[in-house]
Amino acid sequence: MSHDSSPQPLTAAPGAPLRGRLRPPGDKSISHRSMILGLLSQGETRVEGLLEGDDVLRTAAAAKALGAGVERLGPGRWRVQGVGIGGLGDPADVLDFGNAGTGSRLMMGVVGGQPVTATFDGDASLRSRPMRRILDPLTRMGTQVLSEAEGGRVPLTLRGPREAIPITYETPAASAQIKSAVLLAGLNAPGVTTVIEAAATRDHTERMLRLFGAAVSVEPHGPGGHGRKVALTGQPTLRGTDVVVPADPSSAAFPLVAALIVPGSDVVIEGVMMNPLRIGLITTLLEMGAQIERVAEREEGGETVADLRVRASRLNGVDVPAERAPAMIDEYPVLAVAASFAEGRTRMSGLHELRVKESDRLAAVAAGLAANGVRHTVEGDDLVVEGDGAAAPGGGTVETHLDHRIAMAFLVMGLAARNPVTVDDGAMIATSFPSFLPTMQALGGRIGA
């Protein structure tokens, strides 16, 4: 899917309660990593429940270009034949990641630590996003940046060393992508590569490295033990394995909030990953008074998963602490929508990282709230939403800036607002939730062109 094609406006209108069951798409973080670690393993990796959105398919194509055998066996079922650490080949063409920030940054870590040369590129949105924070530690590990666009952006070309240099690196920002890129580069380093982070970020890379056979230790670090010290022993033999991808909590967030704010709704969301570093939104919504019940907890793909029963609820404003941001960085747009229907003030603190997402997501959320009559202020890196317990006015058109989460968040608003809400383009929703429209329509949601 090209992000340069003509826009596809969508409108959501209020209607009947949402009812039914759904399973959101597979988790994007685990889907990317299953392809990447499958590439770096010896033997075969089989993946069930892969998210077949554009972002992950770009990562799969890059793994194939670097030498892996990649085959789709059926819906969500894939086989990856790995080449092992050090076995990558130079790709014949540019690695085009489209809109995939995660896939591109993680694969920079892979290429940056191996004796291979590759050029990375993407769409207009990806070309605007900073890569310097990834390139800085990689150059310390021996990666050469042969060419780059201004400001360390794609298109850029990397050449990795015969062996990476093991380093100890303190991340300058709470970013699982920086941590993961360094650890992936460290797979081809003789010795221990250590990443120190001031606040714990999502730990899928560490969990999945262990699943594939790497030795990774994680210890609390810093004041109050809020940070983490992650150490990887380099040059392991990774073994292909079977991966069952749980449902993505960041995608589950949209039907979840919709069920909370559309009166009379009662929805069950199946198989959602409950990793403690990914459920900041659920924690926050429970504090706001949401009726969310966890049932049938079980293990899948090295992660705890559960079914969530969600019923329409009266919500109250809360303060969301900055240290929760890493556990819900992708969920703030839809939390802002929930806050628009709550009684009282909701303050979301420390949202600096939202400014370097697919769009300046903080500015995009604020503009969307303004277009739909929601009282709010942006104070530095804080977003404050003033709700009066009634339905948001709605009636506006939201500029998505090619950002799938902005599009879905404001379509959710439209299902419960007093007036329909339009987003200027819904095409990019396919990057993370290809079945969003039919899924919401099956629950009774009125969304269409």
Curated annotation (Swiss-Prot):
Binding positions (phosphoenolpyruvate): 28, 101, 129, 177, 361, 405
Positions with a binding annotation for 3-phosphoshikimate: 28-29, 33, 175, 177, 330, 357
A single BP term in Gene Ontology: chorismate biosynthetic process
List of catalytic residues: 330
Entry EC number(s): 2.5.1.19
Organism superkingdom: Bacteria
Cellular localisation: Cytoplasm
Region named Disordered: 1-30
One Gene Ontology term of the molecular function aspect: 3-phosphoshikimate 1-carboxyvinyltransferase activity
Gene3D superfamilies reported in the protein's UniProt record: Enolpyruvate transferase domain
InterPro entries reported in the protein's UniProt record: Enolpyruvate_Tfrase_dom, Enolpyruvate_Tfrase_sf, EPSP_synthase, EPSP_synthase_CS, RNA3'P_cycl/enolpyr_Trfase_a/b
Keyword Amino-acid biosynthesis applies: yes
GO cellular component, one term: cytoplasm
Pathway: Metabolic intermediate biosynthesis; chorismate biosynthesis; chorismate from D-erythrose 4-phosphate and phosphoenolpyruvate: step 6/7
Cross-referenced Pfam families: EPSP_synthase (PF00275)
Known catalytic reactions: 3-phosphoshikimate + phosphoenolpyruvate = 5-O-(1-carboxyvinyl)-3-phosphoshikimate + phosphate
SUPFAM superfamilies in UniProt: EPT/RTPC-like
Keyword entries, A-Z: Amino-acid biosynthesis, Aromatic amino acid biosynthesis, Cytoplasm, Transferase
Function: Catalyzes the transfer of the enolpyruvyl moiety of phosphoenolpyruvate (PEP) to the 5-hydroxyl of shikimate-3-phosphate (S3P) to produce enolpyruvyl shikimate-3-phosphate and inorganic phosphate.
Subunit comment: Monomer.
Assigned protein family: Belongs to the EPSP synthase family.
Protein name as annotated: 3-phosphoshikimate 1-carboxyvinyltransferase
Organism: Methylobacterium radiotolerans (strain ATCC 27329 / DSM 1819 / JCM 2831 / NBRC 15690 / NCIMB 10815 / 0-1)
